[in-house]
Amino acid sequence: MLIIKFTNNAEKDKKLLKSAGLEDKVKKLLNLIAQNPFQNPPRYEKLVGDLQGYYSRRINLQHRLVYKVYENINTIVVHSMWSHYGDN
């Protein structure tokens, strides 16, 4: 099982997810990626550009869980969990 850490941005997103009623869904995704960050399904995407090296999983139609895996230290860093489209 991998250790999950959160960026400051992702910590802020936790509050938004809770108020939107998405906390349980995110907890399930976090448990899944802690066991195997590359498990498919549910589907994940490799990101490109500024977020190259990160992965994205759908929370719902609007929000994504964006994370990076550091296998050498058994850690996943969650970058964000709120809107992937800039309309926070």
What label would you give each PLM region?
Residues 3, 30-33, 52, 64:
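Hydrophobic alpha-helical segments with strong N-terminal bias
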Residues 1-5, 9-16, 20-24, 57-64, ...:
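Enriched for short, Lys/Arg-rich terminal
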Residues 32-57:
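A short, surface-exposed loop/turn module that caps and links secondary-structure elements
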Residues 23, 27-31:
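Short, well-structured alpha-helical segments
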